[in-house]
A protein has these predicted regions:
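Beta-strand-rich domains and repeat architectures in extracellular enzymes and scaffolds
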Residues: 7-54, 74-86
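A short beta-strand motif characteristic of beta-propeller blades
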Residues: 13-19, 64-75, 112-119, 164-169, ...
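Non-catalytic accessory segments flanking enzyme active sites
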Residues: 23-30, 39-40, 49, 64-65, ...
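Residue-level detector of Asp-centered blade-edge/turn motifs that repeat once per structural unit
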Residues: 31-33, 87-89, 132-134, 182-183, ...
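Hydrophobic beta-strand positions that form the internal "hydrophobic ladder"
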Residues: 36, 92, 138, 187, ...
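A flexible loop/linker signature enriched in serine peptidases of the S9 family
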Residues: 40-50, 73-79, 94-102, 118-125, ...
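Short loop/turn segments that connect beta-strands within beta-propeller blades
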Residues: 55-59, 106-109, 159-163, 209-213, ...
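Hydrophobic or amphipathic alpha-helical targeting/insertion segments
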Residues: 91-107, 111-114, 128-131, 138
Length: 396
């Protein structure tokens, strides 16, 4: 028998306590050979964030905690953070929240500090690091708060033996995304200045890396105060790619030596606003095919972009959101969101396109009858444009 009661007075089985006590926040997926890593923010551990590992022999749902107690993998660079760790050959390099220093944790060992203690505490902060094997160092963004006034940002090198960071690039207000070419001879990065935000206007720069590790002949490739460029990345063949909103849409480009070549122009967003470091919405398969995420008509999609045929094939998924995409040998992994299930870390077999859920962010089970599945809608707006929205139909 149906019972009618006033709006707002019915008792929902979904409570804030049940959601928080049984949930974690997943983020920052990384690949290191066949091993998959990601970060977990756990409310039951005081909100600390740690790195976990899933190996090829592990069962779905089974993970190994990498970060020991008393460490919290978070960076405060630009305050929004992101890009707090990387993994290379089984070693995890990370920023610790309490002191903002860089640490290395080798397999089976306790973390060792790499960067010096400074005054004031947390006066030097690090983010978005990449490995420079040839020079036995990390290249990362460094934010210096040791002097009064506004913080000074730079791209710097940190020796794997430890020590004071050595500045490689400076002079602008903000930096992000230092990315080394596969042969280690070129470094690309993103930079911008006040009053622009990174989704307003940025620049993509490129420099040669000399034998002594210094940079030579830095040059701006693309970008200006009205063009947002982000996510520089190198293909296996050593060609620089990036995302730009030069057309009004964040699309994928390839640097052709004189200009950026659009790979598949379309009215879709292949990136989002770069609020934090380490965002990843595309990667390369061994043959140079690009696996990418993009938002089309309000919904996130997963696709394969053939750079020779210039064709984009959508890979059907049950997800409405896909992010933190990482591509490796024969597999990809990403964070996925669904309208009816908790967010998850998902592994994709690139040969069969089979998807496996490795970790859910919540163990709470909600009766589907309480969930209003969203509908993507569009409607005309000013200037002759269409606006898009998500409509949740009443189910009671």
């Amino acid at each position: 028998m149906v019972k009618t009661i006033p709006y707002g007075s019915w008792r929902s089985p979904i409570t804030s306590d049940s959601i928080v006590s049984s949930s974690i926040r997943l983020g920052a997926v990384r690949l290191d050979g066949p091993d998959i890593y990601w970060s977990e923010l756990r409310p039951t551990e005081g909100g600390r964030q740690l790195v976990v590992r899933y190996g090829p022999e592990d069962a779905p749902g089974s993970v190994t905690d990498v970060t020991p107690a008393l460490f919290n993998v978070r960076t405060r660079v630009h305050e929004y953070g992101g890009g707090a760790y990387l993994v290379h050959k089984g070693a995890v390099y990370f920023s610790n929240f309490a002191d903002q220093r860089l640490y290395v944790q080798r397999a089976g060992e306790a973390p060792e500090v790499l960067t010096p203690e400074v005054s004031p505490a947390a006066g030097l902060r690090y983010a978005d690091a990449v490995m420079d094997e040839a020079n036995d160092r990390l290249i990362c963004v460094v934010e210096d708060h040791r002097q009064s006034g506004e913080a000074v940002n730079a791209i710097a090198a940190v020796s794997l033996k430890g020590g004071v960071p050595k500045v490689l690039v400076s002079g602008n207000d903000f930096y992000s995304s230092p990315r080394l070419s596969p042969d280690g001879t070129e470094l690309a990065w993103i930079t911008w200045n006040h009053p622009q935000m990174p989704w307003d206007g940025t620049e993509l720069w490129l420099a040669k890396v000399l034998e002594d590790g210094s940079l030579s002949r830095p040059q701006k490739l693309v970008g200006n105060v009205k063009e947002s460029v982000c996510q520089p990345r190198w293909s296996p063949a050593g060609t620089l790619h990036f995302i730009s909103d030069a057309t009004g849409w964040w699309n994928l480009y390839r640097w052709e030596g004189e200009r950026g070549e659009p790979l598949f122009p379309m009215e879709s967003e292949f990136s989002g606003p770069q609020w934090n470091f380490g965002q990843s919405s595309y990667g390369f398969e061994d043959d140079g095919t690009i696996l990418c995420t993009y938002t089309y008509e309000g919904t996130a999609r997963l696709g394969r972009l053939d750079t020779l045929a210039r064709s984009l094939d959508e890979i059907p998924t049950p997800y409405c959101g896909v992010g933190s995409l990482q591509v490796g040998k024969g597999l990809a992994t990403f964070l996925a969101a669904s309208t009816t299930a908790p967010s998850a870390v998902v592994r994709l077999n690139l040969s069969t396109l089979q998807m496996t859920t490795l970790r859910l962010s919540s163990t709470v089970t909600i009766d589907p009858g309480y969930i209003s599945e969203p509908e993507v809608i569009s409607f005309p707006t000013t200037g002759g444009f269409n606006a898009y929205g998500i409509y949740y139909r009443s189910i009671f």
